[in-house]
Amino acid sequence: MTLSKAKAFWQLTRMNRPIGSLLLLWPTLWALFLAADGIPDWHVLIVFILGVVFMRSAGCVINDFADRKVDGHVKRTANRPLPSGLVSSKEALILFSVLVTCSFILVLTMNTLTIMLSSIGVLLAIAYPFMKRITYLPQFVLGLAFSWAIPMAYAAESNQVPPEAWLLFVINAVWTIAYDTQYAMVDRDDDLNIGIKSTAILFGRFDKLMIGLLQLTVLTLLIALGIQLSLPSLYNWGVLAAAGCFVYQQWLIKGREREACFEAFLNNNYVGGFIFVAISASVLI
């Protein structure tokens, strides 16, 4: 394998852009630390961290495979490995299969319930990129895909998926829809020209309002989670910090400029981090 080919594979898996892995990792850590009362099993923790990296990379590969014929017409994606010809469709599918296989080998070390749940996660990862041609709600499917590690984490730690896990699942799914709508705002003009659907297009001139309502829902459900689990007041400071991030994001997207919308999307890494610190500190007290 040449250096240029290796670099193309690296770019195809987005290893050079870890924001997606972080946005997938944070809710996974929320779930692991809550399910384990602050001290997850080290083996489970390692498996899920590696699983996040492998499956996020696999999701990027299958996404670019699905978009290979349209990415060349979008300014932001025209130079990606598949539309530029640096990686063939066959090579992309082989890489996707390798990444999914690695993830499956990892999950085989977990209990039966976790293994069963993992199959749904793979289907969601495959389905998402193709939803952009079918529905204006592909972000809803992404929300499910990016949240599926939550019930898996609970299953791995406790061999059950309690109601709190599904509340956390909904919180993360709604948050994902909000931040991926910001991401979709970056490409909205290009997507309209090539027929790609998104919530950014669906919401239209109400995009900022809808993102705000989604963010308000996230904060409300986070407070409800804290009440349900009797988390200390320290937890609320994390929720308040997340609220501050959401206010900042609303300021960024006010003019709907591409760079500002992308910066708002990136800012969600801090939201995930603040909530993780709040959860982990609260359950360890």
UniProtKB/Swiss-Prot annotation:
Catalysed reactions, semicolon-separated: all-trans-octaprenyl diphosphate + 4-hydroxybenzoate = 4-hydroxy-3-(all-trans-octaprenyl)benzoate + diphosphate
GO cellular component terms, A-Z: plasma membrane
InterPro entries: HB_polyprenyltransferase-like, Prenyltransferase, UbiA_prenyltransferase, UbiA_sf
Cross-referenced Gene3D superfamilies: UbiA prenyltransferase
Domain of life (superkingdom): Bacteria
Pathway participation: Cofactor biosynthesis; ubiquinone biosynthesis
Role description: Catalyzes the prenylation of para-hydroxybenzoate (PHB) with an all-trans polyprenyl group. Mediates the second step in the final reaction sequence of ubiquinone-8 (UQ-8) biosynthesis, which is the condensation of the polyisoprenoid side chain with PHB, generating the first membrane-bound Q intermediate 3-octaprenyl-4-hydroxybenzoate.
Protein name: 4-hydroxybenzoate octaprenyltransferase
Species whose genome carries this gene: Aliivibrio salmonicida (strain LFI1238)
Taxonomic lineage: Bacteria, Pseudomonadati, Pseudomonadota, Gammaproteobacteria, Vibrionales
